[in-house]
From Swiss-Prot:
Lineage of producing organism: Bacteria, Pseudomonadati, Spirochaetota, Spirochaetia, Spirochaetales
GO CC list: cell division site; cytoplasm
UniProt keyword Transmembrane, yes or no: no
Function: Essential cell division protein that forms a contractile ring structure (Z ring) at the future cell division site. The regulation of the ring assembly controls the timing and the location of cell division. One of the functions of the FtsZ ring is to recruit other cell division proteins to the septum to produce a new cell wall between the dividing cells. Binds GTP and shows GTPase activity.
Annotated positions binding GTP: G27, G28, G29, S30, N31, G114, T115, G116, E145, K149, D193
A UniProt-annotated Pfam family: FtsZ_C
Keyword Cell division: yes
Keywords recorded for this protein, A-Z: Cell cycle, Cell division, Cytoplasm, GTP-binding, Nucleotide-binding, Septation
Species: Treponema pallidum (strain Nichols)
Gene responsible for this protein: ftsZ
Protein's name according to its UniProt entry: Cell division protein FtsZ
Transmembrane segments: none
Gene Ontology BP terms: division septum assembly; FtsZ-dependent cytokinesis; protein polymerization
Family indicated by similarity: Belongs to the FtsZ family.
């Protein structure tokens, strides 16, 4: 064991590693936690919180919180975020106890449902009050799930942003740009869970794994604390142009909200490769990133060596302080080109695509989602009114038939005078 001698300062204190906790809220969040655990995510404590006791019993998290049993009797929130919110408030002390001692808390949830949408902002508020760096990584519904659910998700994300240091949003709709249309439903949702896992892992690895140019918890905290919306991209490359390809794929990751980092005020760039990673390749990565962002943006970079990378290079880019106008609220992707999960280009691996594939998809002029019939929103609204759902749900005015959800929320509200 290595002995570390501390310079005397006259003060007594205890050295301890960074404590990172991940809490999954609701069914979607619990599924993401299961995925992270099955992939062997290290140096992280896992918690699952749900109003549905039966669903909670299937969680593999070592700590399970059945929240809101007085409100829901353990039967779930029924898709109502207000019930999810009340459930989390009912068991605020239990949530605080589970999160106690954490330096960093990740909150993961599927937005648009009941428990995740309602409970996640409450959990974020508790975590932040405990002094933890609070990062939410959440998904938004598929477009076919309807306008009402999308509006609930957007409202939940806005609440979450208020109480979190940073929010990373992954629209499920964008999965359709990278999986084959014949991909089974179960596998598609596994890809969504894996995206949540990769987002959390790419950040936690920066803190827990050593590097040649090291990044630590304070680097991550200074980049993400109080920054609102964030974008994260992870790209891998191999071959002669592996570093540049990895950087290009990272900043053009189509699976997040439209990845436009131009307005970011802070960036954290991590480069990981094997022992043959050269300084010239690191310089190439930073050059690609620098050409994309504001020259006055603060950039923190780190480099680490991992023998298991072999001939591959992985680049992680975390961009924070992103203006809301740079975020695609509707979560659309303008590409209709589908990429089979078994046929990625030679310079890309996992669920990410190469720079060449990205450029081909981006330049495609075909209409989005061919074969899907146009949903009749008027019929949907009529059914909702018959069921007594009218006016506001979870504090959200239901959208009219004529509203364009491709327009960002803040612009729609401004036009309404809100």
């Amino acid at each position: 064991m290595m002995n570390i001698e501390l310079a005397p300062s006259g003060e007594e204190f205890t050295l301890s590693p960074t404590v990172i906790k991940v809490i999954g809220a609701g069914g979607g969040g619990s599924n993401a936690v299961n995925r992270m655990m099955s992939c062997g995510l290290q140096c992280v404590e896992f918690i699952a919180a749900n109003t549905d006791v039966q669903a909670l019993s299937y969680s593999t998290a070592p700590k399970k919180l059945a929240i809101g049993t007085k409100v829901t009797r353990g039967l779930g929130a029924g898709g109502d975020p207000e019930i999810g919110e009340k459930a989390a408030m009912e068991d605020a002390e239990a949530i605080a106890s589970a999160l106690q001692g954490a330096n960093m808390v990740f909150i993961t949830a599927g937005m648009g449902g009941g428990t995740g949408t309602g409970a996640a902002p409450v959990i974020a508020k508790i975590a932040r009050e405990l002094g933890a760096l609070t990062v939410a990584v959440v998904t938004k519904p598929f477009r076919f799930e309807g306008r009402a659910k999308m509006m609930l998700a957007e409202r939940g994300i806005e609440k979450l942003r208020t109480h979190s240091d940073t929010v990373i949003v992954i629209p499920n709709q964008n999965l359709l740009s990278v999986v084959d249309k014949r991909c089974p439903i179960k596998e598609t949702y596994l890809v969504a869970d894996d995206l949540l896992r990769k987002s959390v892992q790419s950040i936690s690895d920066l803190i827990t794994l050593p590097g040649e140019v090291n990044l630590d918890f304070m680097d991550v905290k200074n980049t993400m604390e109080g920054q609102g919306y964030a974008l994260i991209g992870v790209g891998e490359g191999e071959g002669e142009n592996r570093a540049v390809d990895a950087a290009t794929a990272a900043i053009n990751n189509p699976l997040l909200e439209e990845t436009r980092i131009e307005g970011a005020t802070r960036l954290l760039v991590a480069v990981r490769g094997s022992e043959n990673l050269s300084m010239g390749e690191v310089d190439g990565v930073m050059s690609v990133v620098a050409k994309t962002i504001d020259p006055d943006a603060i950039i923190i970079h780190g480099t680490s060596i991992d023998a298991s990378m072999q001939d591959r290079v992985r680049v992680t880019v975390i961009a924070t302080g992103v203006p809301q106008a740079s975020i695609s609220i509707a979560g659309d992707t303008h590409s209709s080109q589908k990429i089979k999960t078994s046929s990625y280009g030679a310079v890309s691996t996992g669920v990410y695509i190469s720079s060449d594939e990205w450029n081909r998809a981006k330049s495609s002029k075909q209409p989005n989602l061919p074969g899907l019939a146009t949903r009749n929103s008027a019929v949907q609204e009529t059914r909702m009114e018959k069921n007594g759902v009218k006016g506001h749900t979870f504090g959200v005015p239901l959208p009219s038939v004529n509203e364009d959800l491709d327009e960002p929320t803040f612009l729609r509200n401004r036009n309404k005078g809100l």
